């Protein structure tokens, strides 16, 4: 093995590998700290929903969301969104006239007015996509947090929904799985380690797995 190859492997092992390892361990420690400081399973009820499990409150969204708390911490949480609707025979879902700090009540078609033959759309027409701008839902009240939901299809887009219907979102937060960010950190660390000085190919050649290219170069010279 020539001097240049020895220098590259020495530089990678002595300088880049420890730094990459320290970076990976640091990110992992930050993740463990966020897990220890994460809140337990939290239920953010909207509009006084008393029951969020059942046919009246179907699950409309499930995914991950970053909760940014007023202390500056950012915690990855698993978010379950249930959409509860009020019907004439619905006695389970109750809508509060005095919403608390952590409530969000979406009045379907609240800012939309269409008049055909003097009838408001809130009394007559079916909901359309533009009448239900639910692409982003912000919830306040959980440690001054705000949660942005992307591509959330509102249940008010149901075929039988009317613009006069009141829809409440029930958001349930729980700590995210540990493996998601951990594997991401490991992947970044491994890619960063392998991006310097052809680290993996040099290790493979030193172990005899790959042929040494410099032998052919020396013979040709």
Curated annotation (Swiss-Prot):
Q: Which UniProt keywords apply?
A: Host-virus interaction, Modulation of host NK-cell activity by virus, Signal, Viral immunoevasion
For this UniProt entry, which residues form the secretion signal?
Answer: 1-35
Give positions of region: HLA-E-binding epitope.
Answer: 15-23
Which sequence ranges are marked TM in the entry?
A: none
Disulphide bridges, residue numbers:
none
GO annotation, biological process: symbiont-mediated perturbation of host natural killer cell mediated immune response
Q: Oxidoreductase as a keyword? A: no
What exactly does this protein do? Plays a role in the protection against host NK cell cytotoxicity by up-regulating the cell surface expression of HLA-E independent of TAP (HLA-E has an inhibitory effect on the cytotoxic activity of the NK cell). Also promotes cell surface expression of UL18, another viral protein involved in NK cell evasion.
The record's family statement is:
Belongs to the HHV-5 UL40 protein family.
Q: What is this protein called?
A: Protein UL40
Instruction: Record the organism.
Output: Human cytomegalovirus (strain Merlin)
Gene label: UL40
